[in-house]
Regions:
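Metallocofactor- and cofactor-centric catalytic cores in central/energy metabolism, strongly enriched
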Residues: 2-181, 185-235, 242-302
């Protein structure tokens, strides 16, 4: 898979945080590159699992909390997406409500298994609400539980799919902690600056709207191509190589039009004027990592 060299990306601070929310986002921690765990099998033979941060769950499962909920749900591979619900309250959930595969790409993974791109899609996916700033417990409590359950299910590689801006930080921290505990990960990100700061292992960047790491709604061929590219590009990262953030060669609009940036801003604007969900959620995130990254990585092994 050839990656793009275009340097354009969606700047959440400039497009949303300042003009719409009227508040600066918390400083994003800047980590050193993570150490990688060797992937034991080629992708075509590996069992690949998902870790999504959109808070996907099913009606017979307990709903997750809106913020700092360190629990997760296991989503069986055979459960139809017509039943899935989303506990994450971010305005960009509108995309996932239109097509769950953009945030929880279960159908995409089953298609990649059928096509022989991956050896097998795991029996279940892990799902959290990624609006988390309790980073110590996320790394030392949640990550070990996920690793234990993933290894018991013979998962060889975990694809981490962050959703909102806070998900990109929490998901990156979680991916680093999981990798450090011996389970290879790769992350499919849509916030370039945040991913470049947190440095999740084997990350790739897709210049698509927040909330759509798995592709455009109702475009299954594109969704398969994106997730395949993310997996194949991610696993090509060599242990010991310099960390990088390859840009996947896909555009939201065929002509390259970036009107989707205004759509994302409008989703936040409507929420801010009617519900105030984002600002209320931001007020709950008092734990910050910026300035104490080295101490955190030593303390929490990530």
């Amino acid at each position: 898979m050839t990656t793009s060299v275009d340097n354009t990306f969606f700047d959440f601070d400039a497009k949303v945080a300042g003009p719409v929310l009227k508040v600066p986002l918390p400083d994003v921690p800047v980590f050193d590159a993570p150490a990688l765990t060797e992937l034991a099998l080629p992708l075509t033979e590996a069992t690949v699992g998902l870790l999504v941060t959109c808070g996907a769950y099913y009606p017979d499962q307990p709903r997750m909390g809106y913020h700092n909920d360190l629990s997760y749900r296991k989503l069986p591979r055979e459960r139809d997406l017509s039943e899935v619900l989303f506990a994450h309250r971010t305005p960009i959930r509108a995309f996932a409500l239109a097509d769950p595969n953009v945030a929880y790409p279960r159908d995409t993974m089953l298609d990649l298994e059928r096509d022989g791109v991956i050896g097998r899609y795991a029996d279940f996916a892990f799902s959290i609400v990624g609006s988390i700033s309790n980073y110590d417990d996320l790394a030392t409590r949640t990550a070990p539980r996920i690793v234990d359950e993933a290894k018991a299910a013979d998962i060889d590689l975990l694809l981490v799919v962050p959703f909102c801006p806070q998900c990109h930080v929490a998901g990156g921290v979680l991916a680093r902690a999981i990798e450090r505990r011996g389970l290879p990960t790769t992350s499919l990100t849509t916030l370039y600056k945040t991913a470049g700061s947190v440095k999740p292992p084997r990350a790739t960047f897709l210049d698509f709207p927040l909330g759509c790491p798995g592709g455009r709604p109702d475009r299954p061929e594109q969704q398969r191509a994106i997730v395949r590219a993310a997996l194949e590009t991610g696993v090509s990262a060599a242990v010991g190589a310099d960390w990088s953030l390859p840009r996947l060669p896909f555009t939201w609009n065929p002509d390259g039009n970036r009107d989707w940036e205004n759509l994302v801003a409008d989703l936040y604007r409507v929420d801010n004027e009617i519900r105030g969900t984002v600002l209320a959620n931001m007020s709950q995130h008092t734990d910050q990592l910026a300035g104490q990254e080295n101490e955190f990585t030593i303390r929490c092994a990530c």
